[in-house]
Amino acid sequence: MDFSQFNRKASGYECLGPSVVAEAASYANSCNLSLWMSTRFKAPVDNDFLAKWELRHTAVLNHLKLNILDKFPHAEIDMELPLQTVNLCGNKLFGVADAVCKFPNGQLMVCDAKSGKKKLSHWIQVGLYGYMIQGVARSKGASVPEICGFALCYGNY
């Protein structure tokens, strides 16, 4: 592998995304070097792949939002919510939840849109988003929101 194509993340911004942690936790990717690299370096960008992914992901996001509005008309929905960084076993965890639904009783449901194949790691990833939301509330001394559920929406609708 040619590591010269990778750019070092800025000092203080070394972090892992929930998808990387989820793949390691589900043993979909159990390579320790991969975790180490993901924390410290950005992989080279493949613009063609990224453009195709953005189109598919946007379609699934729209489908997810329509489903949430249909099933939970009284819920407040935050789409593509950037979550604050939290500490997970000495690593910074940063991510963006595709949708967080807040119900009138204060409970939350965390949702993620997926444009690829179904994987066990997707459930772990959406669970980590819930952990992050609760962790930020704890660190601020605020009341910790109750997570009442998780949802995944796949592009094969």
What is each PLM-predicted segment?
Residues 111:
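Conserved beta3 VAIK motif of the Hanks protein kinase fold
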Residues 107-108, 157:
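Hydrophobic residues embedded in beta-strands of well-ordered beta-sheets
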Residues 1-107, 117-119, 123-124, 134:
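Metal-dependent nuclease catalytic cores that hydrolyze phosphodiester bonds in DNA/RNA
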Residues 134-157:
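Substrate-binding beta-hairpin/strand module that engages nucleic acids
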